Structure formats: C-alpha cells, structure tokens
Amino acid sequence: MLLITEILIINFFAATDLVQLYIVYEASLIPMVIMIGVWGSRTEKKIAAFQILIYTLIGSIFMLMSIGLLYSTLGTTDYILIREYIEVLPENVRKIIFIGFFIGFAVKIPIAPLHLWLLRAHVEAPTAGSVLLAGILLKLGGYGYIRYNIGLFPDLCEYYFPIIGGICLISILYTGIATLTQLDVKRIVAYSSISHMNVIVLGLFSGVLQGLEGGIILMIGHGIVSGGLFLCIGVIYDRCKTRILYAYNNLVHMMPIMAILFFLLVLGNIAFPITSNFVGELLIFIGLIKKNIIIAFFSALSMIITAIYSFWLYNRIFFVNEIITREANEGIQMEVNKMTIKEGGINKKVTEGEIIGELEYPQYIKKESMKYSDVNIFEFVSIGLMVILMLIVGMKPSLVEGYIAINCLELISK
C-alpha cells in the first residue's frame, strides 16, 4: 500500500495534464481508504474510511468542474498551454475556475468546516496511516494551491485574500481552542495539524515572498513534526493500550528516552527557535505583517494557543502525579456514568475499560501493566531521524530555502 501511495503521489507532483492530475488525485484515496478500513485500530474504522471517500469525492467534483470549464474554453488540459493563455478568459469564468480548484484542495488541507473527515481518519488509522496522512497526503492540497491557484490566478489570490484569510483565521482559532477539550491524544495532534495547515494557507495566499517561502518551509516542517508526534503516540499506545489523556501517569519514569524525544517534537510543534516550524512560521508572519496587520495579529494567537495545548499534552502524559490522575479519572467516571447503555430495556453502568462510542474509560496506567519500559532501537531510530531532520531544517534553513526561492520569486513577480 505504501508503495502504491508513493507512486500516485509522485505522479501527482509531476502531472502536467489536468486530467492526469485529477485521476491520480482521486486514486491517492484508495490506498488510504484500504489502510484505514482494513488495518484501522478502532471500532469505527469503516465509517472513517467512508468519510474520507465521501468528503474527497465531493470536493473533487468542484475541481473536475474547473478542469472541464478550462477544456471547454481553451480546448486543452495541458498545464503549460493553460498557463500561457489563461489571461484571455473572461473574469467571471476565471473566478469560477479559481473557486473550484480552491474548494477541491481545501478538503485535502483541510479547512474548516471540511475538516471532520481528518479527525476520524487519524483516530481510526494505524500509526503508519496517520504518519502518511499528516506527513504527505495533506501536502497535496498545499501543492495544489501553489501550482493551480497561485500559479494560474495570482491576481485572484490577491482579490480573494480577505475572504480566504478570514476563513483560515476562523479555522485556526476554532481548531486551537477545540484541541483543549479533547481526551484522545490522537485527536489533539490531529486538531493541531489542521491549525498548522491553515497557517500555511495564509502564507501561501499572502502574495508576499516571505509568506510563500514560509508556507513551503512550514509544509516540510509540519510533515516532519506531526509525523514524529504520531510515531510517538503509536509507541505509547503500544505500551499502554489506551489513548485517553488522563490514563497516563508519570510516564517519564517508565519511558525516559521517549519523554526526551516527545519533548523535542513538542518544541517543534510550538515553533521553538532552531526547529523547522520556527523558520516557516516566522517567514509567514513577516509576510502577513506586510500584507495585513490585522490578519497577522490574530494568526499570531495560534502560536500562543499551540504552546498551551502542546505543553498541556506533554505534562499530562509524562508528569501528572498519581493524585491528580486518579482525581481526573474519577471525574471522567462520574461523567461517563451519566451515559447509559440500554440492553433489553435495562440501564447498564459503565465500568473500566468499556467503550462508549469514541470514549473509553481508561484504566490507571501502572509500570507493571506495560509491555516494555521504553523505546526499542527501531523506534528510537525512526523517531530520532524525525528530530534530526527538524533540527537540521531549523538551524540551516538555507538547505531548503535555496531550492524554493527562485520559483517563489517567479510566482510573486506575476
């Protein structure tokens, strides 16, 4: 499945014909749907796979409409020819095509309210699926914006930026605040991923060189950091057999190496200096300040919210003491006991380890109940490579910036 996905993604990035683009864009769904539907880790994996299919197919209808409109007016689906003659189209036609591409790729980013499929997909997906989804598949939307919205319609990006900026700000603030209410650690990272991807969209559509460069660098950094966080959560779940936040207790004593790796990735998630996300977000905010100071101010709030829930997540997993954890568990039990299951007309009280929908009452994690005490060599290398890449890009951003600067200048000059 991973090999098939890789082939489809390479074809998407290399596509020079819009029909080829549409085919591989749709086909890239199939491996992920199978991966979640067959190897998913929870009871609602088939629903998650179905949601991915429906959301993406509905979004791609708008993209197909834009491709059809381009073909009917220009007589070709070749990207090079379309880019050369796109200016001859009437303004209203160009706006319709722009909106169609924007909605089609907005599902893949995703931008609220088109984000619901991603939350369920991450919760139900196996660890490899979550890493692939956060690290690569979401970037198809960002690349689509760069090549087909910004590359073909730079003037309309300027025209629609206030609307796009407002939508992204709502999405950023909503997902950031919603993260603080979650109990499932995978949902927390999934919400964080949505927030970061919307910051990327702001940078890409800012029309400023620094914003565009920052958006591309943050896409790289987000893929590294979010992928690493999902790997860490997968390792912790393998030991503790639960992802409910309040189930964990002082894991720093049981998994000290994991605590260090997780902390470094949390620093990357909050865009701490010398990490890849810092470079990307700094450039984006410089671009937004040049573009619109109000949007820049409210988008900067995302950094504060991200720091709050990231350190809160880390503290709850690795440093919460036994008294706090037991009190929290008692609070959860009181809330869960209000929910009942009717079996044969009889209300059934919820007990430890039982699942109500997506909420599983967690048993208190103790060292003797864990299969291993810390990461093994394979897990250490996998997560460690993510950390090293994050630090390399953060300390030496010119390694990637040099490759994207020329193309960004070309886009901005239009």
UniProtKB/Swiss-Prot annotation:
It comes from the Eukaryota. One of its GO terms (biological process) is ATP synthesis coupled electron transport. The chain crosses the membrane at residues 18-38, 47-67, 96-116, 126-146, 160-180, 188-208, 216-236, 254-274, 293-313, 375-395. It catalyses: a ubiquinone + NADH + 5 H(+)(in) = a ubiquinol + NAD(+) + 4 H(+)(out). Keywords: Electron transport, Membrane, Mitochondrion, NAD, Respiratory chain, Translocase, Transmembrane, Transmembrane helix, Transport, Ubiquinone. The keyword Lipoprotein does not apply. One of its GO terms (cellular component) is mitochondrial membrane. Pfam families: Proton_antipo_M. Belongs to the complex I subunit 4 family. Core subunit of the mitochondrial membrane respiratory chain NADH dehydrogenase (Complex I) that is believed to belong to the minimal assembly required for catalysis. Complex I functions in the transfer of electrons from NADH to the respiratory chain. The immediate electron acceptor for the enzyme is believed to be ubiquinone. This is NADH-ubiquinone oxidoreductase chain 4.
